[in-house]
């Protein structure tokens, strides 16, 4: 499966962002997960 890169639009309920990234519920795109 291809993962979604930085700033790719995504679905918070079906997070397909790459490792160390998280789908932002507010902005609906993949952001770095800093925590």
From Swiss-Prot:
Q: In which tissues is it expressed?
A: Expressed by the venom gland.
One Pfam family name is Toxin_12
Please give the superkingdom of this protein's source. Answer: Eukaryota
Coiled-coil portions? none
GO-annotated cellular components: extracellular region
Tell me the disulfide pairings in this chain: 3-18, 10-23, 17-30
GO molecular function of the protein, one example?
Answer: ion channel inhibitor activity
Q: Where found?
A: Secreted
Query: Tell me, what does this protein do in biology?
Result: Gating-modifier toxin that inhibits both sodium (Nav) and calcium (Cav3) channels by inducing hyperpolarizing shift in voltage-dependence of activation and steady state inactivation. Inhibits Nav1.1/SCN1A, Nav1.2/SCN2A, Nav1.3/SCN3A, Nav1.6/SCN6A, Nav1.7/SCN9A and Cav3.1/CACNA1G sodium and calcium channels at nanomolar concentrations (IC(50)=81-301 nM). Surprisingly, selectively slows fast inactivation of Nav1.3/SCN3A. Also shows moderate inhibition of Cav3.2/CACNA1H calcium channels (IC(50)=1233 nM).
| Primary location recorded for the protein, binned into one broad class | secreted
Which keywords appear in this protein's UniProt record, sorted alphabetically? Calcium channel impairing toxin, Disulfide bond, Ion channel impairing toxin, Knottin, Neurotoxin, Pharmaceutical, Secreted, Toxin, Voltage-gated calcium channel impairing toxin, Voltage-gated sodium channel impairing toxin
Q: What is known of its domains?
A: The presence of a 'disulfide through disulfide knot' structurally defines this protein as a knottin.
Does this UniProt record's set of keywords contain Cell wall biogenesis/degradation?
A: no
Looking at the keywords, is Cell division present? Answer: no
Which family is annotated? Answer: Belongs to the neurotoxin 10 (Hwtx-1) family. 59 (Tltx) subfamily.
Q: What name has this protein been given in UniProt? A: Mu/omega-theraphotoxin-Tap1a
Question: Other comments?
Answer: Negative results: shows no or weak activity on Nav1.4/SCN4A, Nav1.5/SCN5A, and Cav3.3/CACNA1I sodium and calcium channels.
**InterPro entries associated with the record:** Huwentoxin-1
């Amino acid at each position: 499966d291809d993962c979604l890169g930085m700033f790719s639009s995504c679905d918070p309920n079906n997070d397909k962002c790459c490792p160390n990234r998280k789908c932002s519920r507010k902005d609906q795109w993949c952001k770095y997960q800093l925590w």
